[in-house]
Design a protein with these regions (language model features):
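A glycine-biased structural micro-motif
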Residues: 11-13, 167, 184
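Active-site proximal beta-strand in glycosyltransferases
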Residues: 163-169
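Glycine-rich NAD(P)-binding loop of Rossmann-like domains
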Residues: 179-187
Length: 537
């Protein structure tokens, strides 16, 4: 629906309301409408489909998941015949794919764009969710599905006196549709996470001066950008369902099987050869998880990986002082970063690296930024400072469950869910890739989760039952997830994985770390035991 068509929502009665029109939201809409035949409408504050791929259109934006698994499998024709041009698709190509899926299945007619949901409250008397839009209109639905995104709630701290700056401040996840021309300009990029390194490598050769404002250096490996491999296309065409099941039957669903050999089990020369092969192949997740089994759990194994990356860094960066600034003593236990030619960027005469932990960003001036007491004159400041990941978008909606239970209050000490899909005391409420979902790539896992709760809703519909979650089952799931993170180096390395990147956010587990194959086994056992842990009645 267009903005004009989405007006007049007040009093709308639905079977299902879906918040979000990204990867998970589109498939949830398809399942509720086409599989179950329910009266369903979706709501998204964007003007089009895509979710995070609608908003994140900054220079260099692309997936760092193999395009082979960044796709739906429910439409076998598109799964086999969509012509990805690159091994790692650019944002524009991902968005084109999602629009093609939505158009083929006529999903947009059931989506209210430019519509923000501010509040969702369960009414026990009518057994309905009451949604309130930013315009004050109310919509009622028997089921509520939130597909609001893992990395969609951007975090961009404001430095003092920003209003004085005569240049332009751009927030990467809210990049203007009319792409600003950065050619020849003096640009600062604040942040060197996944977004930052993509922007830096993309614009370094185009801008006049590039100032990289780095707080925390991170280990970076090549991505391996190139044409979509024909052998991958052939494998999908041969048996698409077998390929999908092979991808899901893994730890992280990134299109490879995780390593089974300890990094400490090989002689140094053999270990180095394996790292070199992974380096030449590219992909951060592959380097971290496919090479060896214990990089994320053993400090000693982790050091073998960081020693190798450090040797590559030192060989690539000509200035030893800059190489030292790019080196971290932290474990290789954040979201793995990958970008082709990242370290080599710092050999360019127009690129300057600043350590803003030692010399903090103080404030804006008319001409730029004061960093460590020195003014840097700038035309553009790009904020690439990350996301309030996992929980951020859920908490932007005031969500009220049974008995007036407030989700934000319940999650004060950290999120609590069952299987990453439901919350005790919030009836007929489902999440796509909510907190305590598996630590994986997303599209195929979104599909799996939506299929799971579609079956649960179908079972409930037969008797018009309400679906809720037992507190004990939720507590047990949260404990399993907390124990799983505690056994990894992710637990003791500050990052968005454990919420440490957001001031005041609880530092806690937000993931099921047992891998997708184990997750499916756990959740299928629950289903086969009459949906043990769910309350259907």
């Amino acid at each position: 629906m267009t903005e004009a068509q989405s007006k007049g929502l007040n009093g709308l009665e639905l079977d299902v309301a879906i918040i979000g029109a990204g990867v998970g939201g589109l498939y949830a809409l398809y399942c509720m409408r086409e599989k179950l035949g329910l009266n369903v409408q979706s709501f998204d504050m964007a003007s089009g489909v895509g979710g995070t791929w609608f908003w994140n259109r900054y220079p260099g934006c692309r997936v760092d998941t193999e395009s082979t698994v960044y796709t739906y499998s429910f439409d076998l024709d598109m799964f086999q015949n969509w012509k990805w041009s690159e091994r790692y698709a650019r944002q524009s190509e991902v968005l084109a794919y999602m629009n093609a899926v939505a158009d083929k299945h006529d999903l947009k007619r059931s989506i209210n764009f430019n519509t923000r949901i501010n509040r969702a409250a369960w009414d026990d008397a009518s057994q309905r969710w009451v949604l309130t839009t930013a315009n004050g209109e109310t919509v009622r639905a028997r089921y509520l599905i939130e597909a609001v995104g893992l990395l969609s709630s951007s975090y961009a701290p404001k430095f003092p006196d920003q209003d004085k700056f005569k240049g332009q401040v751009l927030v990467a996840p809210k990049w203007p549709e009319e792409n600003p021309d950065l050619s020849g300009k003096r640009v600062a990029v604040v942040g060197t996470g996944s977004t930052g390194i993509q922007i830096i490598t993309e614009i370094a050769s185009k801008v006049g001066q590039l100032h990289v404002l780095q707080r925390t250096p991170q280990w970076v490996v090549p991505l391996g950008i190139g044409p979509f491999p024909q052998e991958a296309r052939d494998r999908i065409n041969l048996d698409p369902i077998a390929f999908r099941d092979w991808a899901l039957d893994s730890g992280t669903v990134f299109g490879f099987k995780e390593g089974t050999t300890s990094a400490l089990a090989l002689p140094p020369e053999d270990r180095a050869a394996r790292y070199e092969k992974a380096w030449q192949k590219g992909n951060g997740f592959s380097f971290m998880l496919e090479t060896f089994s214990d990089i994320t759990v053993s400090p000693e194994a982790n050091k073998t990986a960081t020693d190798f990356i450090k040797s590559k860094l030192d060989a690539a960066v000509m200035d030893p002082k800059v190489a030292a600034m790019l080196t971290t003593t932290d474990y290789y236990a954040r979201r793995p970063l990958a970008a082709d030619g990242y370290y080599e960027v710092y050999n360019r005469p127009n690129v300057t690296l600043h350590d803003v932990k030692a010399n903090p960003i103080e404030r804006y001036t008319e001409k730029g930024l004061i960093v460590g007491g020195q003014e840097i004159e700038l035309d553009v400041v790009i904020m690439a400072t990350g996301f309030d990941a996992v929980t951020g978008n859920y908490l932007k909606i005031q969500t009220i469950g049974r008995g007036g239970a407030n989700l934000a209050e319940q999650w004060t000490g950290g999120p609590r869910t069952f299987g990453g899909m439901t919350i005790a005391g919030f009836p007929n409420f489902f999440m796509v890739f909510g907190p305590f979902s598996p630590f994986t790539s997303q599209p195929l896992v979104h599909e799996w989760q939506v299929n799971y709760f579609t079956d649960l809703i179908e079972a409930a519909e037969k008797t018009r039952s309400i679906v809720d979650t037992e507190v004990s089952a939720q507590d047990n799931w949260v404990q399993i997830c907390q124990d799983g993170l505690a056994g990894t180096l992710f637990q003791i390395t500050d990052s968005w994985i454990n919420g440490a990147n957001i001031p005041g956010k609880p530092r806690t587990s937000m993931w099921y770390m047992g891998g997708m194959a184990a997750y499916m086994t756990e959740m299928n056992a629950i289903r086969d035991d009459n949906y043990r842990g769910f309350k259907v009645g």
